[in-house]
C-alpha cells in the first residue's frame, strides 16, 4: 500500500465536506424532531385547546403522509440531480438551492404561516401541505446531492471512506448539539420578547433561524471548499433505484428481509424515544432546563461508539454487538420508566440508550447480503440493497412524527401545559406510548436478529468461496448473447510478478483453485486493467472483481487466497462498478504484507466466469517474470 500524502487542497476539501454535514444534520434534527414539538407547544398558542388539538392531529397526519410519499419520489429526485449539468457540477447547485429554499420555507412554517392558523385554519391547512411538500422536496434534493457527491470527490476508496467518516462524525455533533442549545435559546429569546419564562413562538422561530443560517453557511462551505471531478464513466455507472425494486430485493433475499426488519424495529424505538425525550424532561420530570444533558451524553457516547466498532468487531461477531447494543437499549427503557425521578439513573439510562451498534451492523450485513443474493438467486443488487436502510429511516421518522403528535395530545402535553398540569392518567398514557412500546420494539429486534439473521462474517466468507467456485465453473453467469462466431481478446498482465499455471494454484487450505485461467505470484500490490472493458461488479470484501471485455469475455481478477477473511482491510479501489476502463488503468492496491502476516497468500488469480465459451486459452509461460501491461495470452471464445 502506498503512503497517502494529503495536500493542502485535500485537507480543505475534507474539512469543507465535514462541516457541510454539521449544519445539514442539525437542520434535519429541527425538521424531524423539534418541528413537531413546536407544533404541539407553540404553533397554535392562543387558540381554543380543543381546536388546537384537532389542528395538531391534522397537521401531524399530513406530515406523515408527505413523508411516506417521499419514499416514492426520492428516486425521481435522484434522477433530477443526475440529469443536472452546470459549470459547477451536478451536486453543488442542488446542495445550495435545496438548503436555501428549504431553510426559507422552514422559517415560514415556524411562523405558523404568519399566524394564519388563528385567522383561517382551513386555508392554513391547505397552505401548510403545499409549503411542507415543497420544503420536503428541496431538503431531499440537498440531502441526495450531499451524500451523492462523495464519488465525485474522489475515485480512491480510501479517500471516499475518509469523506464519509468525517461527514458522519460532524453529523453526530450537529444532531446532538440541538438538545444542548434548544431550551436556553428558545426560553431566552421568548423571555426577551415577551417577558415570559416559557418555550414560546418567538423563541422557536429564533431557534429555527439560527439552525437555518448554520445550514446555509455550511452548504456554502461545501460548495466553495470542494471540487467535483467530472467523470463521464462515473455518470454512466450510476444505477437508478425504485421503491418496487427495493421491496423486490427485500422479499427475494431473506438476509435482506430479516436484518431490515430487525433494524426497522430498532429504528422505530430509537426515533420515537428521541422524539419524546423533550416531553419527558418538560412534563414528566419537570426539568426542561436539564434537557441539555441529553445532547452532551449522546455526543460523547456517539463519538466513542463509531471508532470503537472496528476494534470490537475484530474480537466480537457483529451479531453479538447488535444484541449487546439492543440489550443496553432495553435496560435504558427500564431506567427511564422506573428511575426518571433519579438524576443518576436517568443519566445512566441515556448512556445505555446511546450505546448501540444497530446502524453499523445493519449496513455491513446488508452489504454482505449482496453476495448472498448473487449466490442464492443469481442477481447482484448493490444500489437496491444500499437504498433499503435510508428508506427504513425515513419510514421510521414518519411513524415517529405520528406517534409523538398523538402522545402529546393524548397525554395533555400541548399548548401552554406544564408539569404541574399532568395527571396520573396522562403520565401513564405517555409511558405506554413513549416508553413501553419502544421497549417492546427493542426486545423484538433482538429476537428477530438472533433467530433469523444467519449471515455472519464467517458465513459470508463461505458464501464468497462458494460463489468464487461457481463463477469459475460457469454455474452463475450464463451466456445470454447469440453466437456470432469466434471472438478473440488479448489479456495483459494485471500485475508485476511471476506467471503461474492455473493447475499450480493451491489455496491457503491446500485445495486446488477451480476453473480456467492463469495466476501471478506478485512482486507488488498494484492491480491494473488486463484489457479494455467494463467493471461488472466487486465483492464487498474488495478482494475480487469481474471485468468484461468490449466483445464479451468475462474475467474475474481474484487478489490473494484466503484474503476474503480480511473483509476489505488492506484493499483500495480506484474505480466504480459499471465503469469503463482502459488496459493498464490502475484499479486496485492491496497490502501484501498484511495478507501474508495473517497466513494468507498474495497470489493473483485471473479466471473466466464462462469457461464453456473458451475455445482456446493459449499457452501460459509459467515461471516467466512479467510486468503489468505485458501480453500474457490470446483467448479465443464464442
Curated annotation (Swiss-Prot):
Pfam families in the cross-refs: MFS_2 (PF13347), PTS_EIIA_1 (PF00358)
Enzyme Commission (EC) number: 2.7.1.-
UniProt induction comment: By lactose.
Main localization (coarse): membrane
Localization per record: Cell membrane
Keyword Cell wall biogenesis/degradation tagged: no
Record GO terms (molecular function): kinase activity; symporter activity
GO BP annotations, alphabetical order: phosphoenolpyruvate-dependent sugar phosphotransferase system; sodium ion transport
Domain PTS EIIA type-1: 503-610
Phosphohistidine: residues bearing it: 558
SUPFAM superfamilies named among the record's database cross-references: Duplicated hybrid motif, MFS general substrate transporter
Cellular-component GO terms for this entry: plasma membrane
Official protein name in the record: Lactose permease
Species of the source: Lactobacillus helveticus (Lactobacillus suntoryeus)
Upper taxonomic lineage: Bacteria, Bacillati, Bacillota, Bacilli, Lactobacillales
Gene behind the chain: lacS
Amino acid at each position: 500500500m502506498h503512503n497517502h500524502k494529503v495536500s493542502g487542497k485535500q485537507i480543505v476539501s475534507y474539512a469543507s465536506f465535514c462541516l457541510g454535514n454539521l449544519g445539514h444534520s442539525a437542520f434535519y434534527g429541527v425538521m424531524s424532531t423539534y418541528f413537531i414539538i413546536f407544533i404541539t407547544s407553540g404553533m397554535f398558542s392562543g387558540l381554543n385547546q380543543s381546536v388546537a388539538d384537532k389542528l395538531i392531529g391534522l397537521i401531524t397526519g399530513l406530515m406523515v403522509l408527505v413523508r411516506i410519499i417521499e419514499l416514492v419520489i426520492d428516486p425521481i429526485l435522484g434522477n433530477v440531480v443526475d440529469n443536472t449539468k452546470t459549470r459547477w457540477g451536478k451536486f453543488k447547485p442542488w446542495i445550495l438551492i435545496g438548503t436555501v429554499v428549504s431553510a426559507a420555507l422552514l422559517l415560514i412554517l415556524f411562523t405558523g404561516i404568519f399566524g394564519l392558523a388563528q385567522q383561517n385554519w382551513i386555508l392554513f391547512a391547505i397552505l401548510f401541505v403545499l409549503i411542507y411538500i415543497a420544503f420536503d422536496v428541496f431538503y431531499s434534493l440537498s440531502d441526495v446531492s450531499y451524500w451523492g457527491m462523495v464519488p465525485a470527490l474522489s475515485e480512491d476508496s480510501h479517500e471516499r471512506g475518509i469523506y464519509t467518516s468525517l461527514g458522519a462524525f460532524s453529523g453526530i455533533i450537529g444532531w446532538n448539539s440541538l438538545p444542548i442549545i434548544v431550551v436556553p435559546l428558545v426560553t431566552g429569546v421568548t423571555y426577551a420578547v415577551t417577558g415570559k419564562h416559557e418555550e414560546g413562538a418567538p423563541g422557536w422561530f429564533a431557534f429555527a433561524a439560527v439552525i437555518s443560517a448554520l445550514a446555509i453557511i455550511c452548504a456554502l462551505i461545501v460548495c466553495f471548499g470542494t471540487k467535483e471531478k467530472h467523470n463521464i464513466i462515473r455518470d454512466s455507472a450510476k444505477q437508478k433505484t425504485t421503491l418496487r425494486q427495493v421491496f423486490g430485493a427485500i422479499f427475494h433475499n431473506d438476509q435482506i428481509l430479516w436484518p431490515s426488519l430487525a433494524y426497522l424495529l430498532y429504528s422505530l424505538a430509537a426515533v420515537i424515544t428521541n422524539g419524546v425525550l423533550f416531553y419527558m424532561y418538560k412534563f414528566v420530570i419537570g426539568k426542561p432546563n436539564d434537557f441539555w444533558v441529553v445532547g452532551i451524553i449522546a455526543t460523547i457516547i456517539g463519538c466513542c461508539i463509531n471508532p470503537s466498532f472496528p476494534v470490537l468487531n475484530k474480537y466480537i461477531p457483529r451479531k453479538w454487538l447488535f444484541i449487546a447494543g439492543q440489550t443496553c437499549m432495553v435496560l435504558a427503557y427500564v431506567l427511564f420508566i422506573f428511575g426518571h425521578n433519579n438524576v443518576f439513573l436517568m443519566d445512566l439510562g441515556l448512556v445505555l440508550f446511546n450505546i448501540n451498534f444497530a446502524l453499523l451492523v445493519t449496513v455491513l450485513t446488508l452489504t454482505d447480503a449482496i453476495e448472498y443474493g448473487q449466490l442464492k438467486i443469481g442477481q447482484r443488487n448493490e444500489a437496491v440493497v444500499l437504498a433499503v436502510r435510508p428508506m427504513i429511516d425515513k419510514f421510521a421518522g414518519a411513524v415517529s412524527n405520528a406517534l409523538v403528535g398523538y402522545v402529546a395530545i393524548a397525554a395533555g402535553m400541548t399548548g401552554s401545559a406544564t408539569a404541574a398540569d399532568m395527571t396520573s392518567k396522562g403520565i401513564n398514557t405517555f409511558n405506554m406510548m413513549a416508553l413501553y412500546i419502544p421497549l417492546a420494539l427493542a426486545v423484538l429486534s433482538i429476537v428477530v436478529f438472533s433467530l433469523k439473521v444467519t449471515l455472519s462474517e464467517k458465513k459470508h466468507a463461505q458464501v464468497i468461496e462458494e460463489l468464487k467456485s461457481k463463477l469459475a465453473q460457469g454455474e452463475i453467469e450464463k451466456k445470454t448473447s447469440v453466437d456470432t462466431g469466434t471472438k478473440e481478446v488479448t489479456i495483459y498482465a494485471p500485475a508485476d510478478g511471476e506467471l503461474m499455471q492455473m493447475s499450480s494454484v493451491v489455496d491457503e487450505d491446500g485445495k486446488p483453485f477451480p476453473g480456467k485461467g492463469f495466476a501471478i505470484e506478485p512482486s507488488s500490490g498494484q492491480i491494473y486493467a488486463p484489457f479494455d472493458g467494463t467493471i461488472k461488479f466487486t465483492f464487498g470484501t474488495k478482494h475480487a472483481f469481474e471485468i468484461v471485455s468490449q466483445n464479451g469475455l468475462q474475467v474475474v481478477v481474484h487478489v490473494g487466497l484466503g484474503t476474503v477473511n480480511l473483509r476489505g482491510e488492506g484493499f483500495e479501489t480506484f474505480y466504480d462498478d459499471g465503469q469503463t476502463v482502459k488496459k493498464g488503468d490502475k484499479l486496485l492496491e492491496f497490502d501484501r504484507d498484511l495478507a501474508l502476516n495473517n497466513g494468507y497468500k498474495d497470489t493473483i488469480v485471473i479466471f473466466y466466469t464462462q469457461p464453456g465459451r473458451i475455445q482456446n486459452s493459449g499457452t501460459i509461460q509459467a515461471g516467466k517474470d512479467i510486468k503489468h501491461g505485458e501480453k500474457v495470452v490470446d483467448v479465443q471464445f464464442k
